[in-house]
Amino acid sequence: MDYHIAILNADTPMVEITSAYGDYADMVKSLLQSGSEYYSTEWNLVTKTYEVYKNPNDYPQKEDFPNINAIIITGSKASATSDAPWIKKLISFVKDVLFKYPHIKIVGLCFGHQIVAKAAGVPIIQNPKGWEVSSTVVQLTENGEKFFGRKVININQMHQDMAVDVPEGFELLGSTEDCEFQIFYKPRQALTFQGHPEFSTEVVNTMVKVLRGTEVFTEQQKEEALKRSENPADNDFLAVSIVKFLLE
């Protein structure tokens, strides 16, 4: 069967990433391909990327909505707290899909997780505990254990903003020590991660090394992040989980 996914691309990574691993939309496609292979699904995945951070008019048209099965919102170095016109437009679009077109599933990754939360009425703030970086243990809630079939998962992180609550109608599936609201789930409609299931260990380590010693990461933060990456994220498992959600 054809399964149509609109990828709302919210940024271009640093050149050190794009030259080796592609952009965020490419990483999402790789994630979906990986999940499809492990899940052994026979869907014919059809993706179209919309560069929403570049062009405020580059969105799926309403007449296309009946044929769209899902949207995926990528990560971004931009903040979901920003009043930038393109971010306001993105929040408005996601809110429209969330409340008016429930047949369209939504997956949000990091910035995308925050955009979905904000579209559902939850404020986003800068985490007073600072950055959360690299492979991080997510402790699953009771609902999270039911959804994933395990008690903990490791997810790559690269963020300093966070949601402050669970959106109405959503379930909280997991938390970390520094960020309580890590994974949101609305049955048969939305699945969002504060982390980056689409980031490989190599992608995270490259980002950390490029940003070390800058105003973003200190040398100590870099060393700690690289050490945590020795306990790799459960990317294959997460890819399968996302595909299973899309096929619910």
UniProtKB/Swiss-Prot annotation:
One of its GO terms (molecular function) is transferase activity. PROSITE patterns: GATASE_TYPE_1. PANTHER family: GLUTAMINE AMIDOTRANSFERASE YLR126C-RELATED. Residues 13-217 form the Glutamine amidotransferase type-1 domain. One of its GO terms (cellular component) is cytosol. Pfam families: GATase. Keywords: Glutamine amidotransferase, Transferase. It comes from the Eukaryota. This is Putative glutamine amidotransferase-like protein C13C5.04. The lineage of its organism: Eukaryota, Fungi, Dikarya, Ascomycota, Taphrinomycotina. The keyword Metal-binding does not apply. InterPro entries: ChyE-like (IPR044992), Class_I_gatase-like (IPR029062), GATASE (IPR017926).
